[in-house]
Amino acid sequence: MMVVAALLSWFLLGLFIHYSKKFGWGQPIRQDGPQTHLAKEGTPTAGGVAFVLALLLVFVGLLAFGGIGQANLSREVMILLAALGMGVVGGIDDFLKIRSRKFGGKKELLAREKFPLQVLVALLFAGFAAPLASHQLLPGFMSIGGYPIFDMLFIAFVMVGSVNAFNFTDGLDGLLAGVGMIVLLPLVAVSPIAALMVAVLLGFLWFNAHPARVFMGDMGSHAIGAVAAGAYALYSDVWLLPIAAIIPVAAVLSVVIQVASVRLRKRKVFKMSPIQHHFELSGWPETHVTLRFWVVTGIATALTWWLMGGRP
């Protein structure tokens, strides 16, 4: 089914790119970013719609033909619903960006608008997931303080953090697709949703490799972050996710550090945040940043697999 998912993602993305160009669904580019990115102005965005749809269709097919065991069905449905919920939040942002480029008006969801929606989806997921999170939430601890409410809040925190961390990792051709696939690899044998996400990202990467013909947008990055958080929470030790996802963690931390430094010290720590753009402005070609970040993610994920004991 992974092959089917990859091919369906590839096919749907081809259609999406065609109609995006026809209707002018292009990505606006930050003028204060790397100058090499200005040529990307107008590249179709919100490609996450296509690969999330591919994931959903194949998952429904698996359900229809009994391809998902009853033991894991509730976990898989929870992860899927979290991915769709977060994807909708990101999709609203994508819609506003595309519409504003053509017609003006509101350019994006503000942080104070997006964050509460993310928290709502995360809390709904965590409320159902916490009782099923049978592995360690923190090293050596199956629970936090022995109170289920703390476990729920911690899982919700991880979900929101993951979604934003993966979102900040986007911005270079192929970067997030590759990082997302690698982070999910340890769980493909036990989580059909994780396996399908890896597969649909392969189909997406065909078009997103440098020079990218399509960007995933916030819908795609939000869905990837939700699947990563959900799968690690329900099938592994959730504290291992920040190790495997070292690049998304570095991306979100670089933004936090940059904002805090500018507000408190009136000085920047990085040439630009998230951190991938700092390396670009330091002279690294975009493709080098992407490939090296993939390598770092591969090493971190291998360490995660070892810490798992070679099992999810």
Swiss-Prot record:
Its main location: membrane. Its cofactor is Mg(2+). One of its GO terms (biological process) is cell wall organization. It is a multi-pass membrane protein. It catalyses: UDP-N-acetyl-alpha-D-muramoyl-L-alanyl-gamma-D-glutamyl-meso-2,6-diaminopimeloyl-D-alanyl-D-alanine + di-trans,octa-cis-undecaprenyl phosphate = di-trans,octa-cis-undecaprenyl diphospho-N-acetyl-alpha-D-muramoyl-L-alanyl-D-glutamyl-meso-2,6-diaminopimeloyl-D-alanyl-D-alanine + UMP. GO terms for molecular function: metal ion binding; phospho-N-acetylmuramoyl-pentapeptide-transferase activity; phosphotransferase activity, for other substituted phosphate groups; UDP-N-acetylmuramoyl-L-alanyl-D-glutamyl-meso-2,6-diaminopimelyl-D-alanyl-D-alanine:undecaprenyl-phosphate transferase activity. Pfam families: Glycos_transf_4 (PF00953). The chain crosses the membrane at residues 1-21, 48-68, 76-96, 115-135, 140-160, 165-185, 214-234, 238-258, 289-309. One of its GO terms (cellular component) is plasma membrane. The keyword DNA-binding does not apply. Belongs to the glycosyltransferase 4 family. MraY subfamily. NCBIfam families: mraY. This is Phospho-N-acetylmuramoyl-pentapeptide-transferase. It comes from Deinococcus radiodurans (strain ATCC 13939 / DSM 20539 / JCM 16871 / CCUG 27074 / LMG 4051 / NBRC 15346 / NCIMB 9279 / VKM B-1422 / R1). The lineage of its organism: Bacteria, Thermotogati, Deinococcota, Deinococci, Deinococcales.
